[in-house]
């Protein structure tokens, strides 16, 4: 028998729109299209004034305002599940306790490594970094000022994770965690999270953007222009190509000036800046290949499955979750992360093997339809919600955190 659910979805979005925001919106659209009721509380980091960033980091430990907001919403409706996509920094873990007060199951999607790493990426100074992974107090991150380049702000973030680790929030106030890949699940288990509270469910692309034909012939990069995304490696690889080929770059970020300067000297490379989702889908469908050169442990790499949905194969770093998302030599190619020479070699392969690339287009689209489209993904999400509800019924109610404990 069909059982429609009533879900309260929470998400704190960043100042620059990214994959987490699109993934949250896709799940909301998917659930509603499947007949479930979804209400949202969406907070945007644009509310943060630069002069208050340290204060906001401190507030991330416990936001009474967010607790009251969720408490009030739960009193007004009969919700089955509180699904938190990202609570940092304005919502805070206080929202879990509001749900516990009302006996509502809590699900947290692990869209980043915030609970394991103050700077969220497990990446520092151009290299992977796991110094804080298993530590209750993330003192290496504090020493390096990993959050916004500030030791004080990093200490505030580290205090949040340490406080809630010691209090038992991650263990007792969340009924179920959704990891996007087995790699992410394993990382959180390595950091001490209980394996029986971690399930794997990938991102979804909904609605279906439709399959393109790759007739534009260009290569495409879509993402934040920042060091961990590997855009510098991509530009170095492009300089090594032995023939002319157009590269289109979509996105913005701290490396925007570098990309702009590179484009001024290399007419085959075009920086388009940020673009709306519908336009990005069209660009993907017309591309010969999408390049995903990330140098951090992507929790998923959403743009890869968006590309698969349009039938466009992907060249991705052989790193972390990216090894799981596609199938090498069927939906794209993998290269050694940070190795511009290897990436250039893979780009040449795409140019030299048009028939195989056409076959990859078919397989990429098929993979999307079987693994990343709506029906299977929604089934897995509902199963996760039902698992969380069972766990919630067995859990002891938790009231509001008393001020003397803070």
Give the positions of each predicted feature.
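A conserved mid-protein helix/loop that constitutes part of the nucleotide-sugar donor-binding site
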Residues: 21-22, 217, 221-240, 254-258, ...
């Amino acid at each position: 028998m069909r059982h429609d659910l009533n879900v309260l979805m929470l998400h704190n979005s960043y100042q620059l729109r990214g994959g987490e925001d699109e993934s949250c919106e896709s799940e909301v659209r998917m659930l509603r299209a499947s007949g479930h009721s979804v209400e949202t509380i969406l907070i945007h980091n644009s509310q943060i004034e630069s002069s208050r960033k340290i204060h906001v980091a401190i507030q991330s430990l416990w936001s009474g305002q967010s607790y009251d907001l969720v408490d009030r919403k739960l009193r007004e409706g009969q919700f089955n599940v509180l699904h938190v996509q990202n609570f940092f920094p304005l919502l805070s873990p206080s929202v879990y306790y509001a749900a516990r007060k009302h006996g509502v199951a809590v699900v947290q999607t692990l869209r980043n490594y915030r609970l394991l790493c103050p700077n969220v990426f497990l990446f520092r100074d151009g290299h992977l970094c796991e110094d804080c992974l298993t530590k209750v107090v993330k003192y290496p991150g504090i020493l390096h000022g990993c959050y916004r380049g500030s030791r004080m702000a990093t200490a505030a973030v580290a205090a949040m994770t340490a406080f809630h680790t010691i209090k038992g929030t991650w263990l007792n106030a969340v009924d179920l965690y959704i990891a996007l890949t087995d790699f992410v699940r394993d990382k959180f288990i390595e950091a001490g999270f209980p394996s029986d509270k971690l399930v794997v469910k990938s991102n979804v692309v909904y609605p279906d953007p439709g399959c393109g034909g790759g007739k534009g012939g260009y290569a495409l990069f879509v993402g934040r222009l920042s060091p961990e995304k590997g855009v510098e490696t991509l530009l170095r690889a492009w300089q090594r190509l032995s023939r002319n080929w157009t590269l289109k770059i979509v996105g913005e970020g701290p490396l925007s000036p570098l990309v702009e300067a590179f484009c001024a000297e290399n007419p085959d490379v075009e920086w388009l800046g940020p673009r709306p989702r519908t336009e990005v889908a069209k660009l993907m469908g017309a591309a010969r290949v999408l390049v995903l050169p990330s140098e951090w442990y992507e929790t998923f790499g959403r743009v890869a499955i968006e590309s698969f949905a349009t039938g466009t194969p992907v060249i991705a770093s052989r790193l972390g979750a990216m090894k799981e998302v596609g199938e090498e030599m069927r939906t794209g190619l993998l290269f050694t992360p940070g190795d511009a020479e290897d990436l250039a070699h893979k780009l040449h392969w795409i140019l030299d093997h048009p028939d195989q690339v056409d076959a990859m287009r078919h397989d990429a689209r098929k993979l999307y339809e079987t693994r990343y489209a709506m029906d299977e993904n929604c089934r897995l999400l509902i199963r996760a919600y039902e698992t969380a509800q069972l766990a919630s019924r067995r859990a002891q109610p938790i009231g509001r955190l008393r001020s003397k404990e803070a």
